[in-house]
Swiss-Prot record:
Usually encoded in the trnK tRNA gene intron. Probably assists in splicing its own and other chloroplast group II introns. Its main location: plastid. Signal peptide: none annotated. The gene is matK. InterPro entries: Domain_X, Maturase_MatK, Maturase_MatK_N. It is found in: Plastid, Chloroplast. One of its GO terms (cellular component) is chloroplast. It comes from the Eukaryota. Belongs to the intron maturase 2 family. MatK subfamily. This is Maturase K. The keyword Plastid applies. One of its GO terms (molecular function) is RNA binding. GO terms for biological process: mRNA processing; RNA splicing; tRNA processing.
Amino acid sequence: MEEFQEYFKKDKSPQQHFLYPLLLQEYIYTLAYDDGLNGSIFYEPIEFMGYDNKSSLVLVKRLIIRMYQQNFFIYLVNDSNQNRFRGHTNYFYSHFFYSQMVSEGFSVIVEIPFSLRLVSSPEEKEIPKSQNLRSIHSIFPFLEDKLSHLNNVSXILIPHPIHLEILVQILQCXIQDVPSLHLLRFFLHKSHNMNSFLKNNKTIHVFSKETKRLFWFLYNSYVYECEFLLVFLRKQSCYLRSTSSGAFLERSYFYGKMEHIHIIIVYCNNFHKTLWSIKDPFMQYVRYQGKAILASRGAYLMMNKWRYYLLNFWQYYLNFWSQPYRMHINPLLNYSFYFMGYLSSVLINPSAVKNQMLENSFIIDTGIHKFDTIIPVIPLIGSLSKAKFCTVSGHPISKPVWADLSDFDIIDRFGKICRNLSHYYSGSSKKQSLYRIKYILRLSCARTLARKHKSTARALLQRLGSGLLEEFFMEEEQVLSFIFPKTTLFPLHGSHRERIWSLDIIRVNDLVNQII
């Protein structure tokens, strides 16, 4: 970052500095393939077919020499629209490698103007760095504390898909370098054309990871603009109070700091996910991926105003026609909504309180609002069906594509899926429904092993004994007893009713991701 600051301090004239010459600097690619400026754990290692996972200095120098050629980017543009796979396999992998290196290096460069804001910000030291904010489960205690006191809730779908040119226009305010913006357009259209090409060529899947880092950055920029109206209107509604605001970026992760706004960041490896929570006595806003929840204690009319503001803002500011059905307003007590893989609702638990005054006693009936989260069994079975673990009705079937693996690998893959689902749904208030999911995975694993050994699942289980696949039935309290063997004062009876929110979940299982 100090090298970036020196680059921008060399010339004090008002002339606009260009970002694209940084593509010819070797340290840009070192940063791009060193898991980011701060060594973030959220970037997956990038794999290239035919090359090592890390970019060597020789390859970087070779790339820079090719970029000095005047026709390099023109060559990339022409090649992106042609099929160069027939008889040119080695050439294709080499060309794809260089193209992806440029994309990753360019991703670092476009983040520089935003990163410099963070470095120069006087509030840099006040940015929260709590590790448990990275957990996806960290939002549920917040919902338990806030939603039980609210009246109305609105489910929001962030407008999509977005036109590629709008993504470029969003960055024009901070990046006024025209050549860099043109290069950004090139990468966007190149990836768009390649995605349409891959629909007819499913065997070529290496492009699915190309420009991931760049699109994470663009996605955050786009969502930041979509949610800008919420911040703006909240400031206007509190104009009588003293507020201080600051918006800055640490790499591609947005932070915001306001007196009445608290922003929580959540990430995931397969796709960048940002989660915001607006703390306000009358309104709460939470978003995960492209779905958001807006809840308020106010009347239906107030919620309808927010709906009107958001729809018109998206329509006129982002040039995106957002249909009204993307926002539903419902009473919170009579409404269940899917959010982050859970079916959430607010229930009323009736209770009777006996009150005695002198010689008179009477019973007061009251209701306590409680935020409840349960496992959506039917959608989860649908996800298992799409992954070929069972039929649509939930009947376990074998996994033919895994039948060629070793027995250990088959059991290990099924075991990881089962443990991840059990760990993620540890916050459910009714865990009995999770047993059905475990049963499906256990029988699917047994039938996959039986398919490999040309036997039946029943004969396989009888021959190997009941201890087979016992890891599928490891409960959450057993895991806790391993972690805290001496601090547990009593066994966790009725664990199917206990909700356990974990602070180490940074990735959502793909099966859960389909029902979010």
